[in-house]
Design a protein with these regions (language model features):
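Glycine-rich, flexible loop/turn motifs
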Residues: 88, 106, 114, 143-144, ...
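Hydrophobic helix-coil surface modules that form long, contiguous segments used
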Residues: 1-127, 156-159
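Active-site rim elements
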Residues: 66-73, 144, 196-204
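Acidic active-site catalytic centers that drive phospho-/nucleotidyl reactions
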Residues: 128-129, 151
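Catalytic Zn2+-binding segment of zinc metalloproteases
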Residues: 130-147, 160, 164-165
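Acidic/His/Gly-enriched intrinsically disordered linker/tail segments
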Residues: 151-204
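Secondary-structure transition/capping motifs at alpha-helix termini
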Residues: 87-96, 140-142, 163-169
Length: 204
């Protein structure tokens, strides 16, 4: 088994006569408690990198063995989005460490700092979660009542990326999305009931 976490892997130590392994990770940036993560399973690991100015940023993926090819095929989209956001908003916030994906079995994704947990390598989803590294991780809302700030920026930036890459399709899709949202009654950007996880992440 392999362990994935925030930051950089420092070392792995075998114990119990070589039957167990301890993985030591270190993250050197301030972090909100809800962004701390680790996962352990029979991951396959592959590495890549992206040039950001004068820095070569390691890109590290922990995925299920059966998902390796799809994650490898989707890597270029991550590199493209990383360069776009880096050039638009300044340095990737955790440029002295890494960015990567850790596959998990839930739907969607979670923007854990330096290590996004993700179910699949869907282009729109990976861009949305990457955008959170700037808006949601480096800076985050002071209360769950204002989570729309994190999600609003990430949603906007995924559209920003897709518009650059697929300009004609994105305009049509964006109009359809807006029509779908505005045709529904109710909804509020502010979350009044922060005890309801479903409400916190409700798009309405």
């Amino acid at each position: 088994y392999k362990a994935a976490a925030n930051g950089l892997l420092q070392n792995e130590t075998l114990t119990a006569g070589g039957t167990k392994k301890i993985a030591h990770w270190k993250h050197r940036y301030p972090i909100a408690t809800y962004l701390i993560c680790f996962a352990v399973t029979n991951y396959t690991v592959f590495n890549n990198s992206v040039q950001l100015g004068s820095t070569i940023l390691p890109m590290q993926t922990y995925c299920y063995p059966e998902s390796l090819i799809s994650f490898q095929n989707g890597t270029q989209n991550v590199l493209d989005a990383m360069q776009l956001f880096h050039n638009t908003f300044g340095d990737y916030p955790f440029i002295k460490e890494k960015y990567g994906h850790v596959q998990f079995g839930w739907g969607g994704g979670m923007e854990h700092q330096t290590s996004t947990f993700i179910v699949s390598i869907n282009e729109g989803l990976i861009v949305h979660e990457l955008a959170h590294q700037w808006f949601g991780d480096k800076i985050t809302c002071g209360s769950w009542e204002d989570i729309w700030l994190n999600e609003g920026f990430a949603t906007h930036l995924s559209s920003f990326y897709l518009e650059k890459k697929y300009p004609a399709n994105t305009i049509i899709n964006r109009k359809n999305l807006i029509n779908n949202i505005t045709s529904q009654p109710g909804g509020s950007v502010k979350v009044n009931d922060t005890t309801n996880v479903g409400r916190i992440f409700d798009g309405r």
